[in-house]
């Protein structure tokens, strides 16, 4: 469960290291975001010569949460930290060309097939 002010790790090579959620998209009073949801983020920590810089406001998709995601068979997939992949504001395609760490099968929609194909492991 990601809400406003939540700090997340970045799971791609866009140049950002830590980001903060500033808005959960998808409704005027929506409070929480889970795996597969799009959020508005600001870059809090970035590496030099990256594609993004500190202070940029972009969209991102949540790929891992500590809360986890419940499957129809009753199992729950949980992770050690919250992570997201930064998206281009207009096309909503990933800015980075590599994805680090596993992602869940819940991202397998028409929008995020690029992330699934770049990920080293799909759980």
Swiss-Prot record:
Xref: InterPro entries: Ribosomal_uL14 (IPR000218), Ribosomal_uL14_bac-type (IPR005745), Ribosomal_uL14_CS (IPR019972), Ribosomal_uL14_sf (IPR036853)
What Gene Ontology cellular component terms go with this record?
cytosolic large ribosomal subunit
Question: Which GO biological process annotations does it have?
Answer: translation
Q: List the Pfam families hit by this protein, alphabetically.
A: Ribosomal_L14
- Function, in words: Binds to 23S rRNA. Forms part of two intersubunit bridges in the 70S ribosome.
**Family designation:** Belongs to the universal ribosomal protein uL14 family.
Q: What is this protein called?
A: Large ribosomal subunit protein uL14
The species this protein was found in: Erwinia tasmaniensis (strain DSM 17950 / CFBP 7177 / CIP 109463 / NCPPB 4357 / Et1/99)
Q: What is the lineage of its organism?
A: Bacteria, Pseudomonadati, Pseudomonadota, Gammaproteobacteria, Enterobacterales
Q: Which gene encodes it?
A: rplN
